[in-house]
Amino acid sequence: MTEKEIDDKLYLARICHLSGLHEETIKYVEELIKLRNGDITEEERNLLFSSFKTLINFRRDSWRTINALESKEIKNQSSLLPRVTGLKLSLTEEIKNYINKAIELIDNNLLKKVNNNELKVLYSKIKGDYMRYIIEILPKENEEEKNALKEKAEEDYKIGLNLCDTLNNLNTTKVGLLLNYTVFLYEIMKDYKTAYVIANDTYQKTMKSVKDENLDLNVFKDLNKLVNLLKDNISKWSETVKQENNDNAENEELSPEKVDSPSS
C-alpha cells in the first residue's frame, strides 16, 4: 500500500460523489477500506454513507409511489397489477441488497477499528435505521421475518443508547440516534407513549444545553435540524398519546370494581 494509491482512490471517490455516481463512490471507498485494513477517515465515511443514503432513499421513495399505485390497481382489478407488483418487489430486493452490503461493511470491517463511543453510537444508529427500512417494505404476511427484524433493530439501537450518557447533550450523533429511535418506537413498535416521552425529554435537554453553550455555526445548523424534527414529531404525536391515555382511563372506569368479601 502506498500513499499514492490511497490518494488516487480518495480522489476518484470524490469525483464520483460530486458527479452523482454513488455506486462507484462506494466501490472506491470499499477499496480504501481494504487498503487500510478496515480503517477509514471521517471524509471517507461521509462519502460512503452519503452514497448509501442516496441510493437507498431514492428507492424507498420509488417504493412508496409504486405501493400507492399498486393499491389502486388492486381496487380497479387492473390487468397491469402483476407488472406493478413486480416493480415493487424489484425495488424491495434492491433496498435490501444495499442495506445488507452496508451492514456487512460495518460489521466485518468498520466496527473492528472503532475506538471511540461516538462512532459506535453512529454505527448502531445506521444499523437500527436500516433494519427499520426493511421492516417498512416487507409484506404484511412476512410477520415472522418482521418480528425478527424488530428484535434486531431494537438490539442495534440499544447498543448506541447504552453509550449515549458518555456523549454531550449537544452531540448531533447522540441526538440523531434518539430522534430515529423514537421514530422506530412510534411507527414500527406502535409504542406511542414511550416514543413521545423520549422525544420530549431529548428536546428539553437539548434546548436547555443550547442555552448554556456557544456552538460552532455548522454544529448549530445540524443540531437545529434535529431539534426541529423532534419538535414536529412531538406536536404530531401528542394527540395520539392523549387519545391513548383517554382510552386507557375509560377502560379502567369500565372494569369491574373489586368488592371485598363481607366479614363473617
Question: Which residue stretches match the model-derived regions?
Answer:
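Amphipathic alpha-helical protein-interaction segments enriched in hydrophobic
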Residues: 119-126, 169-184, 219-232
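Short conserved catalytic/interaction loops centered on acidic-Pro-aromatic/His motifs
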Residues: 169-175, 188-198
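N-terminal alpha-helical interaction modules that lie
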Residues: 1-129, 133-139, 148, 159, ...
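Hydrophobic/aromatic-rich effector regions of fungal transcription factors
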Residues: 130-135, 177-189
